Amino acid sequence: LTPGTLTAFATVEWDNTNRYLMVFYFFGLLWNVAFINYMTIFIVACCVAFWYFSYDNPDNRPRFPICKSLWWAIRYHLGSLGFGALLLAIIQFVKFVLMYIVHYVQDLQKKGLENKMLVWFLKCMVCFVSCFEKVIQYISSIGYAYLAIAGTNFCTSCAKAFTLLVSNPMKF
């Protein structure tokens, strides 16, 4: 910030430390958003599992299924939730870096430095990473539902959920 100014607006001097911190904070934001999303999926899947498996005997249902699901998520499955969110955050971060590079190269084209093959290749990479991100999101959400039911770790749950999806292709 500029010292000695009496304005409501301040300027920031972007040195390398500030740039690295901004990248670090952005990655943390991606990780936290994915973690909260997967925590929500897990809690809803636990509540549905409580209801489904105690349908015949309502006395077996917990009084507060959301609180119990949150407790199970924190106590038993926090690492699995964090690992899946980290995996998704890394993929999203790579996608945003590629999108930044595409934008930078297109700005260079406006200045007269043309490289259409590079832009095409980078856009193909962004498309590939976006498709991979959607696949990981889908398999992870099904894996977290399986995790809520079976209680296994993240990788095992995703593998079993994927096997279940592949063995029943008409259902999804």
What do these predicted ranges mean?
Residues 1-172:
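Hydrophobic alpha-helical membrane segments
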